[in-house]
Amino acid sequence: MAETSNNKTSEEAKANEKKSQSETLEESKLENMNSEESTETTQTESMETAETETSLQTELESAKKEIESLKDSWARERAEFQNFKRRSAQEFVSIRKEAVKSLVSGFLNPIDNLERVGATQTNSEELKPFVDGVTMILKEFYSVLEKSNVIRFDPKGEPFDPMSMEALSSEEGDQYSEETVIDVYQPGYYYKENEDKFTLRPARVRIGKPKS
């Protein structure tokens, strides 16, 4: 009986050992599976992170290129606008010059005629009031023109300026160190507004020149 009991105990011990080994093996398999799953998860996450970074980098480069393109476009638009403003300003000045010339030129010949009458020397008591009246009218004309920025100029004694004067005759002499206006046949007119100045009619003059 004792021997039978010992055999049973031995068999139970072996069974328990096998069971324990089986459980240990199962646990080892589970650990390996968990480890593999963890590794796969980590690799997947790393790949997703890398893909996300690559995508963000691509978007960033695209955004940079778009910004540079917008900067270039803005610079071109600004340059074109500045050119347009400059052309518009130049065209406006040109149109204004022509308008002023057209308006003033209609007054200049009558003014020239009145100046000739006003310069008439007379001892006639009948004509003197008329000449004085013409002189007063001329002064009013000059005042109106000046208020409109139109200036009359008589350059006698001044250096000759081909931009605002027209030499109709000349003479040479040792007394002249440079080309100088010695007589004015017809006064000139110019328009001036701020720093902008242009000749409406050149003064017609006689000049003295150094001997050649």
Curated annotation (Swiss-Prot):
Main location: cytoplasm
InterPro entries: GrpE (IPR000740), GrpE_coiled_coil (IPR013805), GrpE_head (IPR009012)
Localization per record: Cytoplasm
Matching Pfam families: GrpE (PF01025)
Gene Ontology molecular function terms on file: adenyl-nucleotide exchange factor activity; protein homodimerization activity; protein-folding chaperone binding; unfolded protein binding
Domain of life: Bacteria
Region (Disordered): 1-68
Gene Ontology CC entries for this record: cytoplasm
Key words of the record: Chaperone, Cytoplasm, Stress response
GO biological process, one term: protein folding
Positions with biased composition (Basic and acidic residues): 9-30
Compositional bias ranges of the Low complexity kind: 40-60
PANTHER family: GRPE PROTEIN, GRPE PROTEIN HOMOLOG, MITOCHONDRIAL
UniProt similarity note: Belongs to the GrpE family.
Task of the protein: Participates actively in the response to hyperosmotic and heat shock by preventing the aggregation of stress-denatured proteins, in association with DnaK and GrpE. It is the nucleotide exchange factor for DnaK and may function as a thermosensor. Unfolded proteins bind initially to DnaJ; upon interaction with the DnaJ-bound protein, DnaK hydrolyzes its bound ATP, resulting in the formation of a stable complex. GrpE releases ADP from DnaK; ATP binding to DnaK triggers the release of the substrate protein, thus completing the reaction cycle.
Assembly with partners or alone: Homodimer.
Name the UniProt record assigns to this protein: Protein GrpE
